[in-house]
Design a protein with these regions (language model features):
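Substrate-binding cleft and catalytic face of glycoside hydrolase catalytic domains
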Residues: 69-85, 100-178, 272-274, 317-322
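Short, acidic/polar
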Residues: 50-64, 146-159, 205-214, 295-304
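C-terminal motif of bacterial Sec signal peptides marking the signal peptidase cleavage site
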Residues: 17-19
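Aromatic-rich peripheral "rim/lid" segments of glycoside hydrolase catalytic domains that contact
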Residues: 27-34, 279, 283, 295-300, ...
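N-terminal substrate-binding region of glycoside hydrolase catalytic domains
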Residues: 30-104, 128-141, 175, 221-227, ...
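Aromatic-lined carbohydrate-recognition surfaces of secreted/lumenal glycan-active proteins
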Residues: 119-123, 169-178, 186-210, 259-267, ...
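Bacterial signal peptide processing site
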Residues: 21-23
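Glycoside hydrolase catalytic-domain groove-lining segments
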Residues: 99-105, 109, 113, 120, ...
Length: 353
């Protein structure tokens, strides 16, 4: 009887364990389906600035040294002013790295070193006017702009397909164009999908991303992350981290609604006083070098977002190919090269690679 009881108990125990295991697996499956993908490896990117010359191994070694696993390659098109519909691109007057041939050579060189690519064609308006204000004054000009932009972006979608790049950015900070012509954007995304089968994003300005109407058609919510996070001349890590709290809450909520991860298509801080106050500013009026402000704001960004499940990674703004000749402790611009913040980035990227 004890033997029978023993076997009966064992059988019931196995049934119980099987049932619990099944419920646990089922619950896990439901949880995984309802949540965003979690990866210990993030997109640790640099914005690889176009140059006059071809890229060689000496230009890529510093990118490897900082443990970047992605680079944004950025060919350019140029527009004369905010109401002009013609985009000039891929011309002999441009720097090599701004053209299709140059972008292709950069991609090949980076790929050979195991660095993945976001191809990010961008528009530059003469005199540095903000592209978010690009807006036509007539239907005729809107149609011309649409055709010109289609030619521009399809040219590089074809390059993305040819080079099998991992990620393609369909535009950068073009809010008025998107607000006024949403049907064009949805149509051109379909055209791009027919050519290029990799992942797609759009680089929305930090205060624009909630108004972009086509995130459902893309793979990542791209944000140029120049959020104001601190008012101090030399903010501490704690102050800047507190400044990130509200933005993180907004980003997480938006990611949850769209069921897509946030990708910082650009992020970074200048090495100047008040680096966290208006991080989008690139004008030369801000020229008081403050390396500590850059260090603190950068570390706060890493601490605030990089481990989050809703966060895919980001692309540091910006990284020049001639590493030994740029940046340095007297430089007040965005580049981290040859500044103390470079070591902060190196350590952080290594941990998420």
């Amino acid at each position: 009887m004890k033997v029978v009881a023993f076997y009966l108990f064992g059988f019931l125990l196995l049934c119980s364990l099987w049932s619990c295991g099944e419920r646990s697996a089922s619950a896990s499956t439901v949880s995984n389906e309802a949540s965003l993908p979690l990866s210990k490896t993030k997109i640790n990117g640099v914005s690889f600035v176009a140059s006059r010359t071809v890229v060689s191994q000496k230009h890529i070694n510093p990118v490897l040294s900082v443990h970047a696993n992605y680079a944004a390659v950025m060919p350019f098109g140029f527009i004369r002013d905010l109401t002009n519909p013609e985009i000039n691109f891929n011309s002999s007057r441009q720097w090599y790295g701004e053209t299709r041939a140059g972008a292709g050579q950069y991609i090949d060189s980076l790929h050979k070193n195991g660095i993945k690519i976001m191809l990010k064609p961008q528009v530059w308006i003469w005199d540095g006017k903000f592209t978010g204000y690009l807006k036509m004054t007539s239907e005729e000009d809107w149609l011309k702009l649409e055709q010109s932009y289609r030619n521009f972006i399809i040219e590089y979608a074809e390059l993305a397909a040819e080079k099998e790049v991992e990620l393609f950015c369909i535009g950068t900070e073009l809010e008025q164009f998107i607000v006024h012509r949403p049907a064009f954007w949805k149509a051109v995304i379909k055209e791009i999908r027919a050519i290029y089968t990799g992942k797609l994003t759009y680089a929305a300005n930090w205060d624009e991303y909630k108004r972009v109407p086509f995130w459902e058609s893309l793979d990542y919510i791209g944000v140029d992350a120049y959020f104001p996070v601190a008012l101090s001349k030399t903010p501490t890590i704690d102050e800047a981290s507190k400044g990130w709290k509200r933005w993180c809450e907004d980003l997480e909520a938006f990611s949850e609604v769209k069921q897509k991860q946030i990708l910082f298509t650009e992020y970074g801080y200048r090495s100047v006083d008040f680096a966290g106050k208006e991080p989008w500013r690139s004008d030369r009026e801000m020229n008081s070098v403050n390396l500590e402000a850059q260090n603190s704001t950068m570390q706060a960004l890493f601490d605030s977002v990089w481990e989050k499940e809703w966060f895919a990674g980001g692309f540091l703004w910006k990284w020049f190919i001639n590493h030994e000749e740029v940046g340095g402790t007297n430089n007040s611009q965005f580049t981290p090269q040859n500044k103390p913040v470079e070591q902060i980035i190196r350590k952080h990227y290594k941990n998420f690679n």
